[in-house]
Amino acid sequence: MMGSSDTPQKPFFYAFNLDDVVPQDHLLRHIDRFLDLSDLRQHLEPYYSHTGRPSVDPELMIRMLLIGYCLGIRSERRLCEEVKLNLAYRWFCRLSIEDKVPDHSTFSKNRHGRFREAEAFRFVFEQVLERCINAGLVSGEGFAVDASVVKADASRQRHHEDDDDWGGGPAIREYLEGLEEDDTVAVAPPKKVSHSDPQARWTAAPGGPAFYAYSTNYLVDTGAGIVVDVEATPAHRTLEVQSTRTMIERLEDRFAIKTKKLIGDTAYGTAEFLGWMVNDKAIEPHVPIWEKGERTDGTFSRSDFDFDEEADHYTCPNDKRLVRYRRKFKQPRSGITKANTINYRSSRHDCAACPMKQRCCAKTPYRKVTRSVYESARDVAREVAKTPAYRRTRRQRKQVEMLFGHMKRILKVDRLRLRGLSGAQDEFLLTATAQNLRRMAKYLGTGPPVVPGMA
């Protein structure tokens, strides 16, 4: 007999518990086990007034944002609607069935105010990272570093002209304040400057049109693929390499974690960065060297010249010396250029009578060999590249790329919603926090978590 859902009389009272309706294998249940925000109120207390009406609970807002970043809900308007309707989201946010969900404008007001001043998102990221460290998911044996370009919320067709008025938006004010600060990193001026987000960098994408973008820089522990630090920069290679120093030193300062080796691509193989790794931090560089000295026209390359470190000179294939100076100065000179290199030159007389001149310096009267002041660190990287361990670590570089792919394809962070470098930093911190929470749910959960509506 066909059944019916009609009942003679509806019950007057219901016994309802949110915990009973959320499945035990739900992703948010696993994440909730590893998310401890008990210290958040104490961290934010100096940024709240002691008088006036009570504000929205900051832990509630953080939990709602984490739902959005963990499950790819990019719009805060939609996030508020989803939390209002979804019982699992209410359970994760500690809301009862009758509690009111905050308005979407609450997030904007707090983000541009006390959350940014207190670095609340950095605090939450480090709380989750500390939980990963205590759970043994971060070993510190090796870190992999890489950067990925993410489109900014800026139109490609609109850029600043010299006679334009900048206006007064938050991203504009942040940019103008940054111009007044001293910048220790030399970066070429951008070709175009966005009118709405001037800190975004005009970037040429391979195989596609250029666009305004920021770079998210990840420092990842190669053990379990945990993001140990993240830094937002304009999309420029020099700034990306500089951010790696910031992340390594910050991790060392706050968690006393010193890595033994750093894995990266050719962008991190500059002489200065290798010198910092080897000489200052005693980090083993698993990085391809940025070589410029090898020639392909049949003439002698720099590797064909032997360097005597004690005597400080090169010896050419014809057994002649290349030295820094051919005469003495009253005041000793270092010979170090602005590019942190030293030029070694041969004698004109030796080169004029040399039978190998056509293979060495056919178009110049003498041969010049340039040596970096960090050449000893480059030699260390060359020796590391010959080891079997280096071949293994090359495969581990993919861990960072997989996280970037997960960020853009699954978590939907392929275009930023917030403007300015601070807005990019907020989004990248929340994304990395969500990825670490999902990692813990995967490795430390009691069973495979079920992610609703996602691949």
Provide a role label for each language-model segment.
Residues 13, 22, 35, 39, ...:
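Generic alpha-helix structural propensity
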Residues 12, 16, 38, 42, ...:
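A generic, residue-level signal for flexible/boundary positions that often mark functional hotspots
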Residues 4-5, 72-85, 95-455:
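Anion-binding and metal-coordination hotspots
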